[in-house]
Amino acid sequence: MLAEARKAAVSETVYIFLDEGGNFDFSPGGTAYFTLTAVTMRRPFLLHDALDALKHDHLEQGLPLLAFHCAEDNKATRRQVFDCIGQHLDALRIDSLVVEKCKTEPSLRAPERFYPEMLGHLLKYVMNDEPAKQAERLVVITDTIPVQKQRKAVEKAIKQTLARMLPAGVTYDLLHHPSCSHYGLQVADYCNWAVLRKWQQGETFYYDKVRRRLFSESDIFRLGAVTWY
């Protein structure tokens, strides 16, 4: 009986992992784009088992790996992680929002404005997913956000959007965990890196490895005609 109840709880819970890329330097010296990516998945996390095995392979080779971080990992590790993701890609839903920063009007650039606006748009796509709509519980996890103002802005965006879109009776938890604590956050980091690299540098080698499960990739200012710098 306990096992059946646990199985039901697992199947009715949806996890959403969030990551961001680019910087908040809205000038020619900053990144051209800012990206937000959500990776949605359910247990059992078979991909996590594969990544855990890969991590221990590294440790046994004398490599002191704490966690996978795409921008910092060497090319061999990066390819191995993307191979793991590719083998379990069908278990993921990936959604990304792309911001061409030079089209972001000055009044929108402060984190307390920017985060709620952009995360709200991203989560609208995420919540169009049938499993997310039918879930009895959502667990939304972001990387630890060191700046309190930004953390509160992220929480505001998520809570406002979920309050509008979730059916009655659906509960959710919003957690801020260090990325090293959960493979889901590391997967979101890898997927977001691939999307940002495509837009920043035009390189699609890694992007092509995940694009089949990229359900949305919204260039939010694609119709914008005004550039601010």
What are these regions (language model features)?
Residues 1-229:
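Phosphate-ester processing/binding pockets and catalytic centers
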